[in-house]
């Protein structure tokens, strides 16, 4: 054994719903969710697809309830499954991710990165990446991102902006962004700035943020 690595201890959240409610009512550096959305808004809620281990079904009902409490009815809410380049969910997978009650109540849209008719062109990043975003997201008045923060071998960390890029981005956007993980010179392997746990100076991460 070369190293014995110990992480910082953290309290285990036994009640995910209660923790979620506390977070959306008293968030860090933001207004409470009920003050962010308002009656008349079209709200898009992005959720991770079935390939990601996220306990969405335990916290999503709380988020939907808070949106409702702000005056936004179910019919003005769309859940976007952030498939990236993955396939669409089956109905059973939607239930596994979102929960049976939410699937019955709320419209669920499966992102398709290759369907250009469902993408909105928002320009180009400073890295030259075309910004093609799912139109349900681009045209929403408010967008709520959910997901898990985790280590990522190219982007530094997963979560946050990755729900949008690659989650609900076009295929061309994803391919151009991910190519940044390769060294600028052909044959030199991977870009040394794109590595696990590194955000500052990581061009792949910075491009994602621009998207």
Region roles according to the model:
Residues 69-88:
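Auxiliary alpha/beta "docking" domains used to position bulky ligands
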Residues 1-24:
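N-terminal amphipathic/basic leader segments beginning at the initiator methionine
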Residues 164-211:
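Extended, low-polarity segments enriched in aliphatic/aromatic residues
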Residues 42-53, 78-84:
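Short glycine-rich or small-residue beta-strand-to-loop segments that form or flank ligand, phosphate
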Residues 89-158:
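An acidic, phosphate/nucleotide-engaging active-site surface
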Residues 28-44, 69-74:
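Glycine-rich phosphate/diphosphate-binding loops that line cofactor/substrate pockets in enzymes
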Residues 2-4, 55, 145-146, 152-155, ...:
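Short helix/loop capping segments that flank catalytic or ligand/cofactor-binding pockets
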Residues 53-72:
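Histidine-anchored nucleotide/phosphate-binding helix
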């Amino acid at each position: 054994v070369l190293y014995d690595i110990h992480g910082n201890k953290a309290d285990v959240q036994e009640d995910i719903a209660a923790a979620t409610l506390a977070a959306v009512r008293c968030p860090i550096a933001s207004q409470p969710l009920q003050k962010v959305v308002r009656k008349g808004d079209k709200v898009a809620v992005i959720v991770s697809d079935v390939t990601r281990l996220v306990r969405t079904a335990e916290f999503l009902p709380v988020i939907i309830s808070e949106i409702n409490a702000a005056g936004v009815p179910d019919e003005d809410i769309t859940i976007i499954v952030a498939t990236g380049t993955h396939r669409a969910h089956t109905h059973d997978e939607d239930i596994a991710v979102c929960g049976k009650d939410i699937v019955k109540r709320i419209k669920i849209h499966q992102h398709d990165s290759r369907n250009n008719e469902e993408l909105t062109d928002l320009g180009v990043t400073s890295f030259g990446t075309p910004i093609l975003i799912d139109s349900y997201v681009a045209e929403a008045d408010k967008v709520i991102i959910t997901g898990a923060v985790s280590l990522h071998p190219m982007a530094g960390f997963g979560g946050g902006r990755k729900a949008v890029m690659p989650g609900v981005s076009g295929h061309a956007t994803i391919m151009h962004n991910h190519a940044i993980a390769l060294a600028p010179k052909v044959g030199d392997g991977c870009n040394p700035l794109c590595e696990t746990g590194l955000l500052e100076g990581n061009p792949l991460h910075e491009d994602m943020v621009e998207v």
